[in-house]
Every structure is written in C-alpha cells, then in structure tokens.
Amino acid sequence: MFKGSIVALVTPFRDGAVDEETLRRMVDYQIENGTDGISPCGTTGEASTLDYDEHMRVIEIVIQQVNGRVPVIAGTGSNSTTEAIELSRKAKKLGADGVLLVSPYYNKPSQEGLYRHFRAIADAVDIPQVLYNVPGRTGVNMLPQTVARLAEHDSIVAIKEATGSLQQASELMEMCGDKIDVISGDDFITFPMMACGATGVISVVANIMPREVARLVDAFYEGDMDEARRLHLSLLNISNAMFIETNPVPVKTAAALMGLCAEELRLPLAPLGDASRATLCAVMKSYGLI
C-alpha cells in the first residue's frame, strides 16, 4: 500500500512554536522534488516534544498542504495504548491515509505486550497502520514472529523496520512479506533491503536530498540496478552524517544550513556540537548542498 520514498518530515519551530508557514513550504518542497509520501510527527519530527494540540495541528497542516497529492502517514504512536488509539482516531478524522505506530518506549513490554498493544489499536481504529520497530530508540526489539502474528490483522499493512539488521529484515519478509509491506527505516540500507523485498524507505535524508532518494527508489522499480546501486553508494556519506549525533539534530541543522527551516530544536535535544557541525558542513559541501 505504501511504497517509494517517504520522508520522515522534520517539524520546524520558530520562537518556541511550530512554524506553520515553513511547514507548508517544506511539504511543497518535498512533493515538487519527487517524494512519494510524507510522514509527520515521527522520531525525526520531534513528536515526543509536541503537546497534543501541536501534534494534531502539524498533522492537519501536512494533510491540508498535501491536498491528496501523495499519501500522508501520520505518526500517532505512544507508550500508552489508550493515547495511541486517541491520536490515531484523530488522525483518521483529519484525513490521514495511514498512521505510523512506534513500539511503546521506556516501559519495555514483552513480545506479548507488543502484540496486544498493536492489536488493540488495530481493533479500535479502522485505518491503514504501519508498525515502527526502532529498538535503538524504544529499548525493545519487536521480533519477526510478533510481526507475523500482527500481519494477520487487516488494518496492519506495513512495518517500518529500523533495526539496521538485514538479517531481521530478511526474516520479516520471509515470514510475512506476502501479508504486509516491509519499509526500510534506515537510509543507509534502503537499496539492500529493497533487494530483499522492501517496498521503499521512510527517509531522514530525503528532508535535504528528496530528489536523490526518490531517484534511488525509482531506479530500483525501473529495474536499473546499476543506477540504484550507484545512488545507494553515493548517498552513504550523507546518510552517515545524519546520525553523527542523535536524530533529528543533524538533519535539522542541515536543513537550516540550506535555508529550509530554522535550526531551532526543543529540549532535551541540544544544538549540534562544534566538531559534529564541522563534519556535517564538510559532508554537505562535498554534495554541493551548501
């Protein structure tokens, strides 16, 4: 259902508030440069620092500005099952095409707890749902066997797999790739994951290089493996630079250097350190981004 280059959109702030005008411009910039879908209010969108009204407003603005041109997969995950259901219901009412549901963080549920959490959301809200497995941020890895159980539910249509493990991604696709889509959650292994059967990527890099990420995915679907491989290798340095410090600090800094938004972050995220900034600038200059 969801395929191609889907941007994990940063949330622009100015003077402590969501910068709505810039957010609208960023949506247009993505679509004009070939992005196939937009996912606001995820990790890269600093969703954990948004209050409920801000969270819903960001989703609403993105849906309005997209205006049906590409799918919108709204981040509505929470470590509270009840809250995730509420956010997902509201996103559906606003017109989201799907929701992105991160595994519950901090409370470290068992595999059975993960299953019951996602099953409860799927039972409560009739909207296409993308599971989001990112154990480096949540503290728990959702195993392929658990995903396979969840894949039996009609509302669960995909998983954003961000373990960085090709072995786990391959096991996912072997176990349930015929029932749900597997989407790369790591820019640096998009091409290898697609070679194993992934349908695309939910990308951090696409915030600053949307055309190139979209072209990589398009080349793969066109059967031009040489071009897809070339783009994969050419993007490795910028992909790595996006994670020299905690995401989304590097990508928001990069976007600010390109004039796409202000550099403003919300605590507890802090500005990029001086050494990391120098590294980021050098990498961006090598790509002609600044």
UniProtKB/Swiss-Prot annotation:
Active-site residues, record numbering mapped to chain: 132 (proton donor/acceptor), 160 (schiff-base intermediate with substrate)
GO biological process, one term: lysine biosynthetic process via diaminopimelate
Main EC class the enzyme belongs to: lyase
GO-annotated molecular function: 4-hydroxy-tetrahydrodipicolinate synthase activity
Gene Ontology CC annotations of this record: cytosol
Annotated site, Part of a proton relay during catalysis, chain positions: 43, 106
Main location: cytoplasm
Pfam families noted in UniProt: DHDPS
Family membership: Belongs to the DapA family.
The protein, known as: 4-hydroxy-tetrahydrodipicolinate synthase
Species of origin: Pelobacter propionicus (strain DSM 2379 / NBRC 103807 / OttBd1)
Gene: dapA
